[in-house]
Design a protein with these regions (language model features):
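Alpha-helical elements of Rossmann-like donor-binding domains used by nucleotide-donor carbohydrate transfer enzymes
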Residues: 30, 52, 86-87, 115, ...
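Conserved core of the sugar-phosphate nucleotidyltransferase
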Residues: 109-193
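Acidic donor-binding segment of Leloir-type glycosyltransferases
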Residues: 48-69
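Hydrophobic packing residues within well-ordered alpha-helices of enzyme cores
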Residues: 5, 35, 53-57, 185, ...
Length: 237
């Protein structure tokens, strides 16, 4: 709910709506405009300050909002991020042949997201940042070259208890080439998994593929905007 971000703002804001100078500099506007011509529909899942989100899209994104579906997550305050992904997947059009998932607090370059969306494989993204437990989602491949994600919600320490062949900082963008399998994964989540992070769904889907079956796309310019300082760094990059 943007708690780290709002430490640096005069009043509480939804961080994907925060901007300086012009609304076009908000993360949601930047993200949507970068992918707009590459996809058939864009699903935005909100919860915290949902009315602000609706109003911003209606008033500041008129040029693209006809392609948007806006979905309300009524458990944003007591469930983890996985429920937002689950709610988004529920409204994906039946005829969709692939799904690209992007976390809402990211800043990235256009060329990298184009590589993700145009890939002919399932895609895992990585970035060039150091792996720091207080903010990174780490990705490693085990001795058999299957992927595993690790993240500490308390931002304390990360632990790996098995041999691994590679380790990356996740770019927190993924492409699912098999929507039917995504829906199947979601269908068999336990109540506890539904309340967890989005890595529950992501791990169950991608954990079945070896590295050679995936396209690992390195995002050239990448910021996870946890703070206003992160946001400013991204805009000035």
């Amino acid at each position: 709910m943007s708690s780290r971000f709002n430490k640096d703002t005069k009043e509480d804001v939804l961080k994907c709506l925060y901007y300086e100078d012009t609304p076009a500099n908000s993360l949601i506007s930047l993200q949507v405009h970068k992918v707009y011509d590459l996809v058939d529909e864009i699903i935005v899942v909100g919860g915290y300050k949902y009315e602000d989100l609706k109003q911003f899209i209606r008033e500041q994104m008129k040029d693209v909002n006809h392609k948007l579906k806006l979905v309300y997550n009524d458990h944003y305050h007591d469930y983890g991020s996985g429920y937002s992904l689950l709610k988004g997947i529920e409204v994906v059009s039946e005829q969709t042949d692939e799904i690209t998932f992007i976390e809402g607090d990211l800043f990235f370059d256009t060329e990298s997201v184009e590589r993700i969306i145009s890939s002919k494989k399932d895609v895992i993204s990585v970035n060039n940042e150091p792996i720091l437990s207080q903010k990174a989602v780490a990705l490693y491949f085990d001795a058999n070259n299957y992927p595993h994600y690790i993240y500490d919600t308390s931002h304390s320490c990360l632990e790996i208890h098995e041999p691994f062949t590679a380790i990356f900082n996740s770019g927190q963008m993924w492409k699912f080439r098999n929507p039917s399998r995504v829906r199947e994964v979601c269908q068999f989540l336990t109540p506890e998994q539904e309340q967890g992070t989005n890595l529950e769904i992501i791990q169950k889907y991608f954990g079945a593929y070896k590295m050679s079956q995936l396209d690992i796309v390195r995002v050239s310019l990448w910021y996870n905007c946890n703070t206003v300082s992160d946001y400013r760094d991204s805009i000035n990059s």
